[in-house]
A protein has these predicted regions:
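Small-molecule-sensing regulatory modules
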Residues: 1-55, 138-321
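Short, small/hydrophobic-residue-rich motifs at membrane-helix boundaries and re-entrant hairpins
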Residues: 20, 71-72, 82
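Short, structured active-site "lid" loops
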Residues: 49-77
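Short, Asp-centered acidic motifs that coordinate Mg2+ and/or phosphate
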Residues: 75-79, 165-166
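A conserved helix-loop-strand patch within extracytoplasmic ligand-binding domains
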Residues: 82-85, 91-142
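Short glycine-rich, flexible loops that bind phosphorylated cofactors or substrates
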Residues: 86-87, 176
């Protein structure tokens, strides 16, 4: 009898839902049963102390415990939100599949059905992301941005309870939980860049598990992989962590899948001299050179002062602790 595969997942409702989708796809592709193994990460436990991700620092807060379970062979493979995955490769592990991406957009969940443009001045909008906070301030400097933590239930609850006027969340998370109807506004990713890898899932297994690697490869979506490779190369070359005020979005061209366009932004986390400062850039090139395109765009942005903005953001976060 073929052994049931063990899939490591975080315990949150969203993580369990995402892992369930991957488990079903693996079963459909291989005929093998998949068991979800719940694992608590540091990112999960830190929520109990209400620490902001931007203040904790470091990388891999949501993935290290899953990777350790893989290396101990407690699980056979693991599913991560790709935007949480550090850009440095993990020794003895491989990114076996990146399934087709969900919608990359950020959305607003606001009281009374408000859109971003018609929120009153001084409205309190919650987010735990420096990237979202910076871009909100670029679009609506008259809003009050409130740092928050928690899962989707907790964040949306700040609005329904009246503590906040709105929160910014990822479309993908709301959609996978069947709650996208709660969104009151949808941000154009050309104007409000998502996090690198947002909306994509990462399926990771041990490098030496050849049979499982081959099976998981059936879930891989080439255009999505090319796009996130470019975005993650941008992030890696900027030497920015997943909590930095960096946005990146690559689109494989619909009429020519051999080409993609990558856009990036680095912004100051707080106003400087009365305004948010930012560096934007974009680049088009072959999909099979996605990593080079990401590195090249990052180099251009660094030449325009992106490093100073990220350093300032780190100092501002440190001063707030």
């Amino acid at each position: 009898m073929t052994r049931t595969l063990r899939l490591g997942t975080r315990r949150s409702p969203l993580a369990m839902t995402q892992s369930g989708l991957v488990a079903a796809a693996v079963t459909a592709a291989t005929g093998r049963a998949v068991e979800l193994v719940e694992i608590t990460t540091y990112g999960d436990t830190s929520q109990a102390t209400n620490e902001l991700i931007s203040q904790i620092g470091g990388t891999g807060l949501w993935v290290n415990s899953l990777r350790e379970a893989l290396l101990r062979e407690d699980v056979d493979f693991a599913v991560h939100s790709l935007k949480d995955l550090p850009t440095a490769e993990a020794e003895h592990l491989v990114l076996a599949a990146i399934p087709e991406r969900e919608d990359v957009r950020d959305v607003l969940v606001a009281r009374d059905g408000h859109k971003l443009a018609d929120l009153p001045a001084g409205a309190r909008i919650g987010t735990g992301s420096l990237r979202r906070a910076a871009q909100l301030r670029l679009l609506r400097p008259d809003l009050e941005i409130v740092p928050i933590r928690g899962n989707i239930d907790t964040r949306a609850g700040f609005v329904s309870s009246g503590k906040l006027d709105g929160v910014v969340l990822a479309y993908a998370g709301l959609s996978r939980l069947g709650r996208i109807s709660e969104a009151t506004d949808y941000f154009d990713p050309a104007e409000f860049l998502p996090a690198p890898g947002q909306g994509a899932l990462a399926v990771e297994c041990r490098e030496d598990d050849t049979a499982l690697r081959e099976a998981l490869a059936e879930l891989d979506h080439r255009p999505t992989r090319a796009a996130v490779v470019a975005e993650r190369a941008l992030l890696a070359t900027l030497e920015a962590g997943c909590s930095a005020p960096v946005g990146g979005y690559a689109q494989v061209h619909h009429d020519d899948e051999d080409e993609l366009t990558l856009a990036g932004v680095v912004a100051s986390a707080e106003p400087r001299d009365g305004a948010i400062q930012s560096v934007h850039g974009s680049l088009t090139g072959p999909t099979d050179e996605a990593a080079r395109l990401g590195a090249e765009l990052a180099a251009r942005m660094l030449a325009q002062g992106a490093a100073a903005l990220m350093t300032a953001a780190a100092v501002q976060v440190g001063d707030s602790q």
